[in-house]
Amino acid sequence: MEILIVGTITVDPERRDAVLAAIRPLVQKTREEEPGCLEYAFTADTVDDGRIVVVEHWQDESTLAAHFVHPNFLATKNRLHERGTGKSVIRKYRVDVSEPVRDSEKRYRADFFTIAEDRS
């Protein structure tokens, strides 16, 4: 089952860009080198200059477990701590269904419409 990780890390607003620049090569390496990595991003919050947003998408639990002991993860974690990032609130979610936000008629849908179509 796919896993999403979503959260935020607090950082001094004056240091946020430097923190992101410091981890950028490691984020890139994670995307390129780690099997099962479907998305991996640390990005500036568009409203709060003191927040970094974390979004990860992993193929399954085993690929996420491998990531947590991979040198890229350990180096990223160390760089974040060395640069004085603050509190983080990061959670993982199991994905049981995935589908587009818009249907075939380009309407935005909050419901999981492909499941409803499969049941009819």
Where are these regions (language model features)?
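N-terminal first-folded block
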Residues: 3-42
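An amphipathic, aromatic/His-enriched active-site/gating alpha helix that lines ligand/cofactor pockets
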Residues: 25-37, 57-92
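Intrinsically disordered, low-complexity acidic/polar segments
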Residues: 16-18, 63, 99
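Residues that form or flank phosphate/diphosphate-binding pockets in enzymes
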Residues: 14, 18, 49, 75
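Non-catalytic surface loops within mature trypsin-like serine protease
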Residues: 11-13, 60, 94-97
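Short, well-ordered beta-strand segments in beta-rich or mixed alpha/beta enzyme
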Residues: 3-10, 41-70
